[in-house]
Regions:
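Sec-dependent N-terminal signal peptides of Gram-negative exported proteins
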Residues: 1-11
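Detector for intrinsically disordered, low-structure N-terminal pre-sequences
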Residues: 4, 14-16, 614, 619
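Extracytoplasmic
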Residues: 393-394, 398, 407, 497-648
Length: 648
């Protein structure tokens, strides 16, 4: 009898680096009840003043406490007790030193430069586990611990860092092998396998379909007496976006995709109901990206690799809600999978809302009752103004808890990037594909998939995101939530067909007749130049930018005069706290001294003077003068949006 008890005890799963590395890439595991069970928790720098102001926004430089170690002042970012594992770390501004103390030890097992750790430059955690994504610094790598983990930060006193530490909290008694940096070599095979597995592989299997009439359906049905799963769902739609057509044209790809509705039922239970493009994280037309569970190919093929189990039968169908027929093809592959009491069904639900951003409010992505695992979201934003739309924090509450297990620091922070950066990126667990926008104005698509950082729940999960926009404006947020749950789970409300339209967010057009500074040829005798973008208020959304010129340095360009005559020459120039004083000379006429320093960033149309100019090119020179005494750190920048000639 004793030997039997020992055998049963030994059979309990042990958590270590290898086991969690497998979870990073094996999507089938998400469709099963976690064994051992765990709760997911996020430790962040969120504003602690939430009790007094629910939308407080001081989300940096907040820590649990300060401790002294060997004369150092270390700020505690996370302090997890009991068996667990850190699986995710993010920061918008990683500087200083980060330390990891395992199992109550007084000496850190890891002590390293935070920026290197989160950018793929630490040899222990190279890409694809550590990397930058549109200015967001990310690390996805398991660090398990048997008794606890404390993460601390030491850095400059004038820097307030943004951070998020994601940890699993296993049940007491769970057997966990604590992370040992020197022993990572033993896990090299598993590390290599995970690195390969993070690169998605799409089966080279054909799609089938045809022309689906208005109101028609393309469907596929599956049966299995042994239990089964769908594991490769792909769709291709014959539709493209044409800039020459109006945004509202019903034949535009983004409108066609919104009115194609993908639905899925497993054993008679409908669990998926999402507009087709949104389901694949590609609401605004065909927007290519590659992530582990979902990819959108450049040829328009959209692929989902989620595991979708069923006990007896499954049905997948696409309804054409367009007024015209649509040519589309589909692929859904099946394989045998035993359906056990711990097997979950795949779910996805969509909602959209256009609403004034004042007063601020919480937008609910999902509100689910039952047992399961929350595994991701997609967000599509139609923002009609240049102001930032995503200051809001995520609030994810599990099993009715009083305070959310996940409380974030900003919408883009949740999606793994930072500083409102609109630059497209694709990573295994998150993406921001290219969309028609200008900085933060226009259309944006974000996706994040919780694979190794999924959120298990026993009775309920609610995912809210603050709709925190810098402007008072009607902004559209459309969201798709993905989760797994036991059969019979209570779902979020059904989508409202009235909200299908993706609102147009027209982008500004260039100033008529402008000679764009970014398009002109420039020569400089010192400093650094670049074409700066991301400002919708600029004529071509870009400017010529000259940084760090020394006194006396000259930037020279030439503007084309269409015909000889008398012209007033204007320039749209940048003014800011770090912009400088310059002598501006048109042709051989006397120069004009100009000071571009002011507290706030702004572009102003300034007259350089009225001149008799010959046909052809006229030289314009900017000579750097002593910086304004009030300039930030004595800096002296120059920004040229465009020149404009007006006949006099």
């Amino acid at each position: 009898m004793l030997s039997l008890v020992l055998a049963l005890t030994a059979a309990k799963p042990t958590v270590d680096v290898d086991t969690i590395l497998r979870e990073m890439t094996d999507l089938r595991l998400l469709a099963q009840r976690p064994d051992p069970w765990y709760r997911y928790r996020q430790w962040t720098s969120y504003d602690r003043n939430m009790a007094n102001d629910p939308y407080a926004n001081g989300d940096a430089g907040q820590f649990l406490r300060t401790e002294e170690h060997d004369g150092r002042q270390e700020r505690v970012m996370a302090d997890a007790k009991g068996p667990g594992a850190m699986v995710r770390l993010w920061s918008a501004n990683p500087v200083g030193t980060i330390r990891f103390y395992f199992d109550g030890e007084t000496k850190p097992r890891i002590e390293t430069d935070m920026a290197a750790l989160l950018s793929g430059k630490n040899p222990m955690f190279p890409e694809p586990f550590s990397y930058m994504a549109s200015r967001g610094a990310n690390l996805y790598f398991p660090m398990p611990y048997a008794q606890g983990l404390k993460v601390t930060w030491e850095g400059p006193s004038d820097v307030a860092i943004y951070y998020a530490v994601g940890t699993r909290e296993y049940m007491p008694g769970t057997r966990v092998t604590t992370f040992v940096p020197a022993s990572l070599g033993k896990a090299q095979r598993a590390i290599d396998a995970a690195a390969r597995g993070l690169v998605p592989v799409t089966p080279n299997a054909p799609l089938s379909g045809g022309t689906v009439p208005a109101g028609g359906v393309l469907e596929a049905k599956f049966d299995s007496s042994l239990g089964g799963e769908l594991y490769d769902f792909a769709v291709k739609v014959d539709a493209t976006d044409d800039k020459a057509k109006p945004w509202e044209d019903p034949t535009q790809a983004h409108n066609v995709l919104r009115k194609l509705r993908v639905r899925m039922s497993f054993d008679g239970e409908t669990t998926v109901d999402v507009p087709l493009g949104d389901f694949f994280g590609s609401a605004v037309g065909v927007t290519p990206f590659e992530s582990l569970p979902i990819s959108v190919k450049r040829d328009g093929t959209m692929v989902a690799r989620w595991s979708m189990p069923f006990r007896r039968n499954a049905r997948v169908w696409i309804e054409n809600g367009n007024a015209e027929p649509v040519a589309l093809s589909m692929r859904a592959q099946k394989r045998v999978r035993l359906f056990t009491p711990g097997t979950y069904l795949f779910h996805a639900r969509w909602h959209s809302q256009t609403r004034s951003t004042r007063p601020m409010y919480d937008y609910t992505y999902a509100d689910v009752k039952g047992e399961g695992r929350f595994v991701g979201v997609g967000l599509q934003v139609s923002n009609p103004v240049a102001a930032w739309w995503g200051e809001g924090d995520e609030k994810v509450s599990v099993d009715g808890e009083a305070f959310p297990s996940l409380f974030g620091t900003g919408t883009e922070d949740y999606f793994g990037y930072a500083w409102c950066d609109p630059t497209p990126f694709s990573r295994p667990y998150h993406a921001q594909p290219p969309t028609p926008n200008l900085g933060n104005m226009g259309q944006t698509q974000n996706s994040r998939y919780h694979i190794v950082d999924d959120v298990p729940f026993k009775t309920a999960v609610r995912f809210d995101m603050e709709a925190w926009h810098w402007a008072d404006v009607a902004c559209t947020y459309a969201t798709t939530a993905y989760w797994y749950a036991r059969p019979g789970t209570t779902l979020s409300e059904d989508p409202d067909p009235k909200t299908l339209l993706i609102p147009d967010a027209p982008l500004p057009k260039p100033v008529a007749g402008a000679l764009e500074g970014e398009d002109l040829k420039w020569t400089v005798t010192g400093g650094f130049t670049e074409i700066q973008s991301g400002f919708p208020q600029l004529s071509g959304q870009r400017q010529f930018w000259w940084r760090e010129p020394k006194v006396g340095a000259v930037a020279t360009t030439a503007i084309r005069v269409p015909a000889a005559g008398r012209y007033e020459v204007f320039a749209n120039l940048g003014f800011a706290r770090d912009y400088g004083r310059f002598s501006v000379q048109v042709g051989s006429f006397p120069p004009k001294e100009m000071d571009f320093h002011q507290p706030d960033l702004e572009w102003k149309l300034a007259s350089l003077g009225t001149f008799d100019l010959p046909v052809g090119e006229t030289v314009v020179r900017f000579r750097a003068l002593e910086a304004n005494p009030k300039s930030l750190k004595g800096m002296s920048m120059l920004g040229v949006d465009y020149f404009l000639l007006e006949k006099r």
